[in-house]
């Protein structure tokens, strides 16, 4: 199963594409999409959308996973991240991909085994699970890979439970 995980943001959006087969993970590609500061928000969102669609076309993932937004004390930040998240979901939906959403708690639980794990613990586990020489940088990339790993575990277990 080819999964694309995304950690949306207006300035930096992390993405990761992983192959999951036979209870093993393989990294296909990861990186980040950076938009230009000082550019009008609509243009930044349009650039993000275009880059995501190109990545989806290039790799043709079967599933698209994104983290749900948790309540943020900074309303302005929450709104801009929400806009970027909406654009990522739209890019996936218009590309015909099923979209799966996970809470930060679910992602941490699936990757680190503890829902209150710290960022460093999650990053270390992403590195370990994907057998990478170092933690992916920036943080947004590691977070996107964590979402993809989370989806692989959740989706696999849901399918197993339905077969019983």
Curated annotation (Swiss-Prot):
Gene3D superfamilies documented for this protein: Ribonuclease H-like superfamily/Ribonuclease H
Q: Where does Mg(2+) 1 bind?
A: 7, 140
Q: Where in the cell is the protein located?
A: Cytoplasm
Main location group:
cytoplasm
Q: Which residues form the active site?
A: 7, 67, 140
The EC number on file is: 3.1.21.10
Reactions catalysed according to its record? Endonucleolytic cleavage at a junction such as a reciprocal single-stranded crossover between two homologous DNA duplexes (Holliday junction)
Q: Which GO terms describe its molecular function?
A: crossover junction DNA endonuclease activity; DNA binding; magnesium ion binding
* UniProt superkingdom: Bacteria
Q: Which GO terms describe its cellular component?
A: cytoplasm; Holliday junction resolvase complex
Recite the UniProt cofactor note for this protein. Answer: Binds 2 Mg(2+) ion per subunit.
Query: Which keywords has UniProt assigned to this entry?
Result: Cytoplasm, DNA damage, DNA recombination, DNA repair, DNA-binding, Endonuclease, Hydrolase, Magnesium, Metal-binding, Nuclease
Enzyme class comes to hydrolase
Q: Which GO terms describe its biological process?
A: DNA recombination; DNA repair
The protein's required cofactor(s) are namely: Mg(2+)
Q: Where does Mg(2+) 2 bind?
A: 67
Read off the InterPro entries from this record. Answer: RNaseH-like_sf, RNaseH_sf, X-over_junc_endoDNase_Mg_BS, X-over_junc_endoDNase_RuvC
The role this protein plays is: The RuvA-RuvB-RuvC complex processes Holliday junction (HJ) DNA during genetic recombination and DNA repair. Endonuclease that resolves HJ intermediates. Cleaves cruciform DNA by making single-stranded nicks across the HJ at symmetrical positions within the homologous arms, yielding a 5'-phosphate and a 3'-hydroxyl group; requires a central core of homology in the junction. The consensus cleavage sequence is 5'-(A/T)TT(C/G)-3'. Cleavage occurs on the 3'-side of the TT dinucleotide at the point of strand exchange.
Spell out the family assignment given in the record's similarity comment: Belongs to the RuvC family.
Q: How does it assemble?
A: Homodimer which binds Holliday junction (HJ) DNA. The HJ becomes 2-fold symmetrical on binding to RuvC with unstacked arms; it has a different conformation from HJ DNA in complex with RuvA. In the full resolvosome a probable DNA-RuvA(4)-RuvB(12)-RuvC(2) complex forms which resolves the HJ.
Q: What is this protein called?
A: Crossover junction endodeoxyribonuclease RuvC
